[in-house]
From Swiss-Prot:
Keyword field: Tumor suppressor
Function: Candidate tumor suppressor.
Organism of this sequence: Homo sapiens
Name of the protein: Deleted in esophageal cancer 1
Alphabetized InterPro entries for the sequence: DEC1 (IPR031718)
Amino acid sequence: MTMNVLEAGKWKSIVPAPGEGLLAVLHMMVFTDALHRERSVKWQAGVCYNGGKDFAVSLARPKAAEGIAD
């Protein structure tokens, strides 16, 4: 499974690390739930590099992500 994430203003396709597929499923469930309820729930996906080829995919609401980045 691949995910498209926005990093440094550019979209990248990544392959989640084992176990990270659950986050993708959670993201799709939240998006689908928002469509069914006719409201918008925005989430921001980010990649956290641990050095080398290791990384993790994280999901956060944009306001929370801004607080972390500051």
